[in-house]
Amino acid sequence: MHLNNLNNFNNLENNGEYHCSGPIIKKPFRHIALTVPSSDITNFNEIFYVEPQYIAQAIRLTNTFQGAIDPLTLNFNFEKALQIANGLPNAGVTGTINQSVIHQTIEVSVMISQIKEIIRSVLGLVINSANFWNSVVSAITNTFTNLEPQVDENWIVWRNLSATQTSYFYKILFSIQNEDTGRFMAILPIAFEITVDVQKQQLLFITIKDSARYEVKMKALTVVQALDSYNAPIIDVFNVRNYSLHRPNHNILQNLNVNPIKS
């Protein structure tokens, strides 16, 4: 696991070296499950915790990281994701992980709690919102349980199946922007490579109280990007071919000093 600090980002805010479209105002968030027609396929279970005027930026970044998905295997290419992240304007990588995190017989609920704390570390930000962390727990829970309704979703790929074992990929992408992130948005794409000593049909109905032998590898990185100073129409970003993935922020962070992270 590799973590950078956010001092550079905090210094920029404190020094007033740039301006965004308006002040960050603490306000309640409303949870909406949104399904829209789109000409672009994504292979992430997308979870956004952002103000409405920044939805376009969150979707644009999601589209960007779709480029890290291997079109043949649908696996998440960690090195490609780093390359994409290091090329984003007004942004920096603040945390990464690319390693095995579970290799034991474990109760699913315990595993969910452990992975939540790993995500907290990789995120590298102090997020106080209980609603956000509830969304994180829900997403992790759905990575390992409630699989039957998700069996054909784009973010899950079934791999090696046998009478005693099941392997699958599962990909999530979090976007977070609120008073805790200040004038930045954090994007956290996560890919799980999961092997369970359970036959697939059984696994589809596994619960948080069940135990099994799991091998779980996590590949993830956190990218923090300055908030856009423009409000793009949401309709544009549902067709990546008509929308620039690297549209410049007109208030560029001249002194953003975050070193690229190498794989």
From Swiss-Prot:
Coiled-coil annotated spans: none
Matching Pfam families: Bac_thur_toxin
Gene Ontology CC: one annotated term: extracellular region
GO annotation terms (biological process): sporulation resulting in formation of a cellular spore
Keywords from the named record: Plasmid, Sporulation, Toxin, Virulence
InterPro entries, per the entry: CytB_endotoxin-like_sf, Endotoxin_CytB
Description of post-translational modifications: Active after proteolytic processing.
GO MF, any single term: toxin activity
Family under the similarity heading: Belongs to the cyt1/cyt2 endotoxin family.
Its biological purpose: Kills the larvae of dipteran insects by making pores in the epithelial cell membrane of the insect midgut.
Protein name: Type-2Ba cytolytic delta-endotoxin
Species per Swiss-Prot/TrEMBL record: Bacillus thuringiensis subsp. israelensis
